[in-house]
UniProtKB/Swiss-Prot annotation:
Its EC number is 2.7.8.-. Disulfide bonds: none annotated. This is Cardiolipin synthase A. It comes from Escherichia fergusonii (strain ATCC 35469 / DSM 13698 / CCUG 18766 / IAM 14443 / JCM 21226 / LMG 7866 / NBRC 102419 / NCTC 12128 / CDC 0568-73). The gene is clsA. It comes from the Bacteria. The active site is at H224, K226, D231, H404, K406, D411. It catalyses: 2 a 1,2-diacyl-sn-glycero-3-phospho-(1'-sn-glycerol) = a cardiolipin + glycerol. Residues 219-246, 399-426 form the PLD phosphodiesterase domain.
Length: 486
């Protein structure tokens, strides 16, 4: 009996070390950033069981077998659709400004579609204005409405939108709603999900959280897009979830959330529609590719129309494209660069690009919320401040609430607006969307919004920053070490 237990003990020990060795080899063989690999190895060797479970759950990008198969199956038809769309030459921009040219070429070559022109665009900064405009558009819809959000939180104006969407479905409008399972957990636990389905709306719970499948798919891979398409002609996107900020997370101690949304009319709705159709097919297996733009209603010839490129990310989409787009935009800056983000945990490459821009004479500003709803990200962000300040970057800490806007403005002409935070999760993991807009008029609108944020912010003083307590420096470095995993 003693021999039996001895053999079992040795087998357990051998299996334990083989498991550690196997995971270590897996980490080393995967092409990833060195800081990320080192952080994972440290966790695994300090807390082996916890580290192994964490790595198997969150260390690699697993979409899940069924969704991965759907993603592979959809691309031939999607690629053909994009190729056929090229015959509509009148919707594509033939040239761009000097500051936007490199970025638009990158996106065209990697996504297979050029930027589209002839769009009318409005930047909305007040949540009530967004909701009221959306309700009007829903009431006037004639054919179809598609929506996707990370968070839909019942209450306030969000309920008014839900009621108008149900009314549209009852009068025969084809309505589809996709919501992230984790972000919209309150919605799916409320009566609204059943009420919408009973009204005829197709409601899909995207990327369902299932602990039984934790090792088969990354549970922290989320559907983070915020998009609305109406009649293949009107589109919305931006940083705002379907929430009323007067009711949303009021116990978090960070104030009301501050967002922007872009409302668009024109062929950009078709470009966004194909992204939505890909998400829908990955989640449901149903193909809903949008029709080509209607030449009878698209304002193609309007000289005032904006040129816009959609940049999508997530499993199945061009890898690393949003990160490349941010790098390209940063290196394209010649006069000034303004970035707004709630969560700032940049890659080494992006941090280097931002610092280099400041060091070559570009006026670089970053606007962040002073109070953050994520303690981990808040502390990790602070670890980058010293290097940024030393390079000459101005850091503004917004004091008017939780600044949730995600925007970049380059030389007053190239604007990036969408759902992408400047952190690892948005850059490489989640389903995200960003609009690249080549237009001085829209750039002026975005600059006015950013100036308003700056007027409600406190400029970080480098001298005072360097005098902060030692315990804060230690906490910052601790969270910085784990920043590749955030």
């Amino acid at each position: 009996m003693t021999t039996f237990y001895t053999v079992v003990s040795w087998l357990v020990i051998l299996g334990y070390w083989l498991l550690i060795a196997g995971v270590t080899l897996r980490i080393l063989m995967k092409r990833r950033a060195v800081p990320s690999a080192m952080a994972w190895l440290l966790i695994i060797y300090i807390l082996p069981l916890v580290g192994i479970i964490a790595y198997l759950s969150f260390g690699e990008l697993h979409l899940g077998k069924r969704r991965a198969e759907r993603a592979r199956a959809m691309w031939p038809s999607t690629a053909k659709w994009l190729n056929d769309l090229k015959s509509c030459k009148h919707i594509f921009a033939e040239e761009n400004s000097s500051v936007a040219s490199s970025l638009f070429k990158l996106c065209e070559r990697r996504q297979g579609i050029a930027g589209v022109k002839g769009n009318q665009l409005q930047l909305l900064t007040d949540s009530d204005d967004v909701m009221q405009a959306l309700i009007r558009d829903i009431q006037l819809a004639r054919h179809n409405i598609e929506m996707v959000f990370y968070i839909w939180q019942p209450g306030g104006m969000a309920d008014k939108v839900a009621e108008s969407l149900m009314a549209a479905a009852r009068r025969g409008i084809h309505c589809r709603l996709m919501l992230d399972s984790a972000g919209s957990v309150a919605f799916f636990r409320s009566p609204w999900a059943a009420m919408m389905r009973n009204a005829g709306i197709e409601v899909v719970e995207a990327l369902k959280v299932n602990l039984m499948r934790v090792f088969l798919r990354r549970m922290d891979l989320r559907q983070h897009r915020k998009m609305i398409m109406i009649d293949n002609y009107i589109a919305y996107t931006g940083s705002m979830n379907m929430v009323d900020p007067r009711f949303f997370k009021q116990d978090a101690g960070v104030g009301q959330w501050v967002d922007v949304m872009a409302r668009m009319e024109g062929p950009i709705a078709t470009a966004m529609g194909v992204i939505y159709s890909c998400d829908w097919e990955i989640e449901t297996g149903k193909r809903i590719l949008p029709p080509p733009p209607d030449v009878n209603i698209m304002p193609f010839e309007q000289a005032s129309g904006h040129t816009i490129h959609t940049i999508a990310s997530g499993p199945g989409f061009p890898e690393d494209l949003i990160h490349q787009a941010l790098l390209t935009a940063t290196y394209s800056a010649r006069e000034y660069l303004i970035m707004t983000t709630p969560y700032f945990v940049p890659s080494d490459d992006l941090l280097h690009a931002i610092c280099t821009a400041a060091q070559r004479g570009v006026d670089v500003s970053i606007i962040l919320p002073r109070k953050n709803d994520s303690m981990l990200v808040g502390w990790a962000s602070r670890a980058f401040f010293t290097e940024l300040l030393a390079a000459g970057v101005k850091i503004y800490q917004f004091e008017g609430g939780l600044l949730h806007t995600k925007s970049v403005l380059v030389d007053g002409e190239l604007s990036l607006v969408g759902t992408v935070n400047l952190d690892m999760r948005s850059l490489w993991l989640n389903f995200e969307i960003t609009l690249a807009i080549d237009d001085k008029g829209f750039g002026a609108d975005l600059a006015a919004v950013q100036d308003d944020y700056i007027s409600r912010s406190r400029l970080l003083d480098e001298r005072l920053w360097l005098k902060r307590p030692l315990w804060q420096r230690v906490a910052e470095r601790l969270f910085y070490f784990f920043s590749p995993l955030l």
